Amino acid sequence: VQMYLDRIDAYEKKGPRINSLIELNSGALQEAERLDIAFEASGLVGPLHGIPIVMKDQADVEGMPTTLGSVLFKDHMPGRDAFVVTKLKGAGAIFIGKATLGELGGGDTHGSLFGSTRNVYDLERTAGGSSGGSGASVSANFAAAAVGQEGFASIRRPSIWNGICGARPTAG
């Protein structure tokens, strides 16, 4: 987890600024330590034990704002985790940050709250669809995986444009 946070610091905060992350989880290192202790005591807590993940800022992660990339929701703090977050945490995932998205979850990766997310390979280009922050974060090696949400190529386009693999979930 520390390696990913150091990379984010070097390339997102001090470096070329891809602008793929809205917020970092201030408790990520403590969660990693808790999982290390659990592993020593009884083994893996689940198949994603200790895997750093970025969540598209469209799903609630308790303790982190959910803004939908819009100034309209800049102060929204959810009281609990979204269902998918609960399941991933139960499998041992560590959420290290919230990824940028197209405002209100639509269109290109641009929002009134954070501006535009850039393509990792060409900072003059976009990162793709509304899950572009998730795609750019994984491509930049800011996390081992990310969660996006598919509408109209919202996962597929950022995956292709950022040189990573994306899986479009089935509906339902």
Region locations from a protein language model:
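Short, well-ordered alpha-helical
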Residues: 1-74, 105-106
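Short glycine/serine-rich loop segments
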Residues: 80-172
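Glycine-rich anion/phosphate-binding loops
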Residues: 75-79
